Amino acid sequence: MKVTILGAGVIGVTTAYQLAKAGHDVTVVDRQAGPALETSFANAGEVSFGYCSPWAAPGIPQKALKWLFMKHAPLILRPKVDTAMLSWLVKMLSNCTSERYAVNKSRMLRLADYSRIALAEVRAGTGIAYDQRMQGTLQLFRTEQQLDASAKDVKALAADGIPYEVLDRDGCIRVEPALSHARDKIVGGLLTPKDETGDCFKFTNALAAKAVELGVQFLYGRTIKDLQVEGGQIRGVVTDQGAIASDAVVVALGSYSPLLLKQVGISLPVYPVKGYSLTIPIVDPARSPESTVMDETYKIAITRLGDRIRVGGMAEISGYTNDLGLARRNTLEHSVMDLFPGGDVSKAAFWSGLRPMTPDGTPVIGATKIRGLFLNTGHGTLGWTMSCGSARVISDLVSGHKAEIDTADLSVARYG
């Protein structure tokens, strides 16, 4: 079968690799000059199978109001006349209940755990290296209130059989020795030891090279204009350099997916939520993290990537903008220097990317009302984490097979 994948980020490339392994004739189309040059370029670097939660959670509306007035706020909202933004916000607020949180977190953990297995198989089968470490994620709490609030996450982890460990201050320092200088600033943490870290850009490029060896064709520098549909069946893709005939098409365009799908009558509640990162060269390993630490106060991930520290986080709801705000950089610097001052921030690279967020936190994976048109998008902050499992699911569905995990609640049909 001739399959065209739209998007060469980590989702598109892992999907291409799995479909090629399944024997399909695969073409990947992207407007950039190479793979992983947009949202997958400099993300936080965490592969967090256990630290995997929807942003829509009980208490978030109240916290959001407080965050809007914080100097180092994890949330930035820039309201505008945008019906897509308003609709998305309303849908997200409707998911901020205990009942919806439990449902959404459970299915996210299901997909994330499947991705853990799939990533291990890809790594074993290809031998690719990407500054990976397998030392877990430490969710770090600065207040007793944060520690107490983690009970709902502990309950979900236990229910899904995900290993975890609740730590006191000394336990956190045992896991991350560099925190010893900041012991008075922390009260405890939640460790998910099966989590990993790695450079998503390096991984995606290395896997793209393996996909080429399997016969995948990458068409870079092409802007996708439209989808060709006849009689309810996908027929191809229209680009600025001509049409590409296809038996099946997988849309993996991240935040830009709904803009394309709207043209063929599919409503997809995915909206861009901008995140920022700093990549800092390490000058003092003793004051640098061993793995990933989530600073719960600022919602910032601090990750060790070889001889670099990647600091990523925040949520800016401002539409399709990639501008770099100095205040956001200051927040990232404040968090990392407060906990892990082992890098030279004067030489840091500052970046922003648009995360494709759904209102319930779960990605949209599966078939659509148009035969042969599939979606693999909306992974939010967890695209790197969920990529390999999502790719396996799509490969099975495109091939006409039953997926190895339950996918009934992952498709766009859940939104009505």
Swiss-Prot record:
Pathway: Amino-acid degradation; D-alanine degradation; NH(3) and pyruvate from D-alanine: step 1/1. InterPro entries: DadA, FAD-dep_OxRdtase, FAD/NAD-bd_sf. The keyword DNA damage does not apply. Keywords: FAD, Flavoprotein, Oxidoreductase. One of its GO terms (biological process) is D-alanine catabolic process. One of its GO terms (cellular component) is cytoplasm. Its EC number is 1.4.99.-. Its cofactor is FAD. FAD binds at residues 3-17. It catalyses: a D-alpha-amino acid + A + H2O = a 2-oxocarboxylate + AH2 + NH4(+). GO terms for molecular function: D-amino-acid dehydrogenase activity. Oxidative deamination of D-amino acids. Belongs to the DadA oxidoreductase family. This is D-amino acid dehydrogenase. It comes from Rhizobium rhizogenes (strain K84 / ATCC BAA-868).
